[in-house]
């Protein structure tokens, strides 16, 4: 369930004398949810739920221009209400070797036929138009795609599957459009912990590497205002596909707001010499 969608800039790590020392009026971009952010050539690009295939562009993460349409659903496998641009959810994007790559979830549960898949498109320009190199089928039957590139150049995709509740999986990639090997389950939410205050949900994975260690941020519990328990956790591993229940932190690093619920799907990116944290 999508509620109270806003792009927020709540804090940064070791951020002295920077933009984030200012008093920022949040939300900086109302109406955008489950957002992915890319920095390229001094500008920031964001897309996600309710952007309908559009990107917003900013020089400073605070002041955003008008939406620019970059991609439309154009393939042979989506049908009916699940085929509209309003079903472009949970973006991730990055630049590699002359091409921009865009991923999103098609997450439609309707009366005609539901579609729950990950889609990949690419472009020579950051603002598109992005096209799907393979229009015959989808990449994977999961949601919330997030790409991590290790120091050796190896790509991994993290994603969410509806199995034991919402579970987080990782998969090695041959290239930005193809997988190498089978998906590896990372973890589900643990019963009788802060992760299962209501439903069994683990989603929105994001991985970074710091001082030789791998860190995954993820969200647990349900977004619904009926509960208001959606929180952000961290797991720490010694390899990109080594996350498990045993290496999770035992507490959430960003708690819930019982007064005004906001879905916190994390995205991190470098801002100067610091890591800025944004979420929706």
Which residues make up each language-model segment?
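Bacterial Sec-dependent N-terminal signal peptides
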Residues: 1-22
């Amino acid at each position: 369930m999508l509620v109270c969608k806003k792009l927020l800039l709540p804090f940064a790590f070791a951020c002295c004398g920077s933009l984030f020392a200012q008093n920022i009026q949040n939300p900086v971009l109302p109406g955008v949810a489950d957002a992915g952010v890319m920095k390229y050539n001094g500008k920031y690009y964001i897309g996600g739920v309710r952007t309908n295939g559009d990107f917003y562009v900013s020089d400073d993460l605070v002041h955003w221009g008008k939406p620019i349409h970059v991609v439309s659903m154009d393939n042979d496998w989506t049908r009916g209400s699940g085929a509209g641009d309003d079903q472009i959810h949970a973006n991730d994007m990055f630049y590699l070797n002359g091409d921009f790559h865009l991923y999103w979830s098609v997450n439609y549960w309707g009366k005609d036929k539901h579609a729950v898949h990950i889609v990949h498109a690419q472009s020579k320009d950051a603002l598109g138009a992005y096209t799907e190199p393979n229009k015959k089928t989808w990449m994977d039957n999961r949601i919330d795609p997030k790409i991590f590139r290790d120091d050796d150049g190896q790509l991994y995709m993290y994603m969410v599957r509806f199995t034991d509740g919402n579970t987080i999986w990782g998969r090695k990639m041959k290239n930005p459009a193809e997988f190498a090997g089978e998906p590896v389950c990372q973890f589900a939410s643990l019963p009788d912990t802060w992760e299962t205050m209501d439903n069994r949900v683990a989603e929105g994975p994001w991985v970074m590497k710091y001082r030789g260690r791998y860190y995954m941020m993820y969200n647990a519990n349900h977004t619904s205002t009926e509960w208001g328990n959606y929180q952000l956790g961290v797991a720490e591993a010694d390899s990109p596909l080594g996350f498990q229940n045993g290496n999770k932190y035992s507490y959430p690093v960003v708690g819930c707001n019982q007064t005004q619920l906001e879905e916190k799907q994390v995205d991190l990116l470098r801002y100067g010499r610091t890591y800025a944290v944004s979420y929706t």
